[in-house]
């Protein structure tokens, strides 16, 4: 295994030096050294390493994009993320719930464009739903059985400031991964965590698909190493299938 890891490190480094975009999903810290080397070599501009520890838990901001472009893929991924947080794995959302969440995301993104004082984050999205979107639902007389706002806010409250997972979707690093060419997601410490794993997997897939769609004429590579345990649920396997379609097409 050590020889295979050494060979893979060598190949991955060669691809990176040739200008490829590389996303690695790993357990076992096989690429930490190479990622640190690239981070140092590029003076911090590249080589992004995501891992989870109690002292420094993994954190993202899926609502932030550097160029301000929220394309159809990005909007869809935000809606899917919210549904993943809200619904149990075996619980299918209704059509009206999907429509309500799509509307909430679109209206929130419109507000970001008109009010530059709002910092894109899960917290400001949650506050928007709790106030502006609530008023809109009341005006439209949307029935609770079509979209249960109180249930949605209650289930997602742990991800809002002061909640158990408030760090997860509110990173203040303002990091857009689109232009980062070497990214490692180390999943060892969360591979059994049924709350964190679906969210992190979604962000991994969205990151790579965004590169596939938006970076033309550039080689992209995703390498899923020794972490099948983290990807065996029905939820995760569907994302792998979703990922494979555009990758094969490319």
Residues covered by each model-derived region:
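Short, basic/hydrophobic alpha-helical segments
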Residues: 11-14, 212
